[in-house]
Amino acid sequence: MSLEFSLAKDLILIKKYIDESLSPSQITTTHMYENKLPSDIKNSVIQVKNSNNIYSHLLKLTSLKNKIKPVTEMNEVYCSKHRGVGCKAGSDAVFETKHIDGPFGMIPKMTLFRCIVTICNETETETIVKENTYNMKEGEFVAIDYNRDLHYIKVKDDFTPGEKAKRYVLKLHYISYPSWCPEIIAKMYGLLNINYNIIARKAFLYTLKPTTFPQKTLNWAINTTTKIWAVFFYKSGPDVSGA
């Protein structure tokens, strides 16, 4: 799926900000929450976030009768680095391992989507969602059910990205919920995911470059739990996302 052509200028501004001001790490992934961005860049993110193409796509994935509610607190600029899945990759190994982002997939009728919007993809990174492969270019996006979709990323087969190759994306979040559902329920569901994401992020950052025994132990726990949960939920979890 693609954004509207009119949003190309906003993606250009965001990319320029990342290159010139954010100065992403050349070793690990780099994240910046939407609410931490400068006002002009935040405005560009808001323009993308309000894309009619994104809203239409999310409704098609759930129900045209549903409502869509943005979850701004989870939105971020993300600069990826492929570090493999070994111990030295730290918590970055999660991204290249088959995983499910959140633990709330058993809650029926409610879906939190994470939309990955590509700003640039010089690394030829492929996003695999439920065995479907997406090699996205600038302005293209894919929607992932945060709590149910098994997914991971990898570099395209037979391609070796250059040392300075970049992959920048926006991670935008939305709740799709039935029109008959009280908004307070949608807000509570959003808070569950927001708070889980905050805790997970703190653990992720703590184990990004594990050197101490506590960091290595937590890193092992994160990566092991990720694999176990993905297998358990993928095999036993029912489809409860329908509107």
Segments from the language model and where they lie:
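Non-heme Fe(II)/2-oxoglutarate
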Residues: 1-78
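Conserved hydrophobic/aromatic beta-strand scaffold that supports enzyme active sites
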Residues: 2-5, 97, 114-118, 133, ...
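A generic structural signal for short, non-catalytic loop/turn and secondary-structure boundary residues
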Residues: 70-72, 108, 120, 163
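Short, conserved beta-strand element in jelly-roll/cupin
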Residues: 102-123
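Catalytic core of Fe(II)/2-oxoglutarate
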Residues: 122-242
